[in-house]
Amino acid sequence: TRGATSTKRRRLARHAQLGKLTRIAPGYYLDTVAITAHPDPGTVVAIARLAAIQNKHPHLISSGPTAAWLFGLPLLEAHPLHVTTVSNQHPSPINLPKIHAGSLHFPAMAVRPHRPRNGRSPAMIRHNGDLLSTTLEDTVVDCALSLDEEEAFVVACAGLHELARYRRFYRNDSRQR
């Protein structure tokens, strides 16, 4: 709703009140049907929340388990959204509201941005043109340092397997993804 006129804000609030729109983050709404009609509504909500965070805070990128999830690496359990700041500042937690879409309920959450390890800004990669995350290499290292042993091992094996599948300097010789 940033930059929206008061008329547009009232219209958004009215649609949200009627249940046509669902507030996913302060100032960000999503069509309720996009959540309720999707076969995996949790994924829709997570991606929408992540997109809202990155739109409002462009210095935050997905990292750790969230980046592993974006890369399609196997995680043994669900994790809260994990973001890292690429600036020198340490932003305060971002509070996301609870979401009610039809009969579906998603709890409110606070996303706590992390500072990069060793003070170096992580390398970034863009997923599907929209969501930014750490590179696969940094994601594997971050997960190895932050997840429990078993889950870290699973993510590391899958990440290293993915890295071994593609040879940047010999693209024509690489196996098809």
Description of each model-found segment:
Residues 1-176:
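Short gly/ser-rich loop at a beta-strand->alpha-helix junction or flexible surface loop bordering the NTP-binding
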